[in-house]
């Protein structure tokens, strides 16, 4: 097993879980963060903010100095909130000029750019150039960070422009409990990974009122159809919906209270929009992406009533208590499938 030097940008749950997996695979892992307390915690063998008093199974190092973190790393992983990607790309760019022939970039940030409605791999391309885009691999799939950290069996997908590099990254992560499977759909993987979070908010909201698997299944069915419409308009491949990054990730995010987006949706009914946003301390990707989803639906003139309704809730235009009632009306108006 080759010992690679790997830099992970981020010290959150996902960054730490992936760092632990890569370290267990025999690599030397450095995490970069801006929170001194988290950095010190990681250097002492813990990330108590996300994993309590569970000690790392292998050694991780962390620093607030970006130059030190990147060092002579062969791989650089972006594992930060999507809202921080712009500023972090600008910082990282300064340290990449002498690494054009070897460094491989890995993106695990989820989202679609709010201003341009472009997938994040294209944002990385616009910031760092075509050379690094050709050496970029994006990972996504059904994976709660806590379960990856606990070494529960997990399967996700990886995609990128260069299939050889994609396979290389897959092998970097693969173990007897963690598997990355290559997929040839850069757009689809990222669109599904983003929009499923907004659907999870819708499902969580409905479950707070009905606590019904029947209702959840109905909303999921219609919501998945809407995601597929949006993805195809953005040039995703139709079959990607049946992959781990498609239906697998949608099911995970829309069916468990471990999902921040699902829990956020439940809180919308219990506490209202304003209070839920104010009290929420963790990143909720679905809330971050709703404006982007609205722009895409409008741009392509897509009929997406479930998405349009949850967007109205998040904009304060529809009372959360009226959301499920509106969904019921949509169910009753469904026509026979041809």
UniProtKB/Swiss-Prot annotation:
- GO biological process assignments: carbohydrate metabolic process; glycerol-3-phosphate biosynthetic process; glycerol-3-phosphate catabolic process; glycerophospholipid metabolic process; phospholipid biosynthetic process
Report the GO molecular function annotations: glycerol-3-phosphate dehydrogenase [NAD(P)+] activity; NAD binding
Q: In which pathway does it act?
A: Membrane lipid metabolism; glycerophospholipid metabolism
Q: Where is the active site?
A: 196 (proton acceptor)
Give the binding site residues for NADPH: 14, 50, 110, 145, 260, 285
- Tell me yes or no: is Manganese among this UniProt entry's keywords: no
EC numbers, comma separated? 1.1.1.94
Known catalytic reactions = sn-glycerol 3-phosphate + NAD(+) = dihydroxyacetone phosphate + NADH + H(+); sn-glycerol 3-phosphate + NADP(+) = dihydroxyacetone phosphate + NADPH + H(+)
Q: Where does sn-glycerol 3-phosphate bind?
A: 110, 141, 143, 196, 249, 259-261
> GO CC terms for this protein?
cytosol
> Keywords of this protein's UniProt record, alphabetized?
Cytoplasm, Lipid biosynthesis, Lipid metabolism, NAD, NADP, Nucleotide-binding, Oxidoreductase, Phospholipid biosynthesis, Phospholipid metabolism
Tell me, in one coarse class, where this protein mainly resides: cytoplasm
Enzyme category, top tier = oxidoreductase
Q: Where in the cell is it found?
A: Cytoplasm
Entry superkingdom: Bacteria
Supply the InterPro entries for this chain.
6-PGluconate_DH-like_C_sf, 6PGD_dom2, G3P_DH_NAD-dep, G3P_DH_NAD-dep_C, G3P_DH_NAD-dep_N, NAD(P)-bd_dom_sf
Pfam families found in the cross-reference section: NAD_Gly3P_dh_C, NAD_Gly3P_dh_N
Family matches, as SUPFAM superfamilies: 6-phosphogluconate dehydrogenase C-terminal domain-like (SSF48179), NAD(P)-binding Rossmann-fold domains (SSF51735)
UniProt cross-references to PROSITE patterns, sorted A to Z: NAD_G3PDH
Biological role stated in the UniProt entry: Catalyzes the reduction of the glycolytic intermediate dihydroxyacetone phosphate (DHAP) to sn-glycerol 3-phosphate (G3P), the key precursor for phospholipid synthesis.
The family this protein is said to belong to? Belongs to the NAD-dependent glycerol-3-phosphate dehydrogenase family.
The protein's name: Glycerol-3-phosphate dehydrogenase [NAD(P)+]
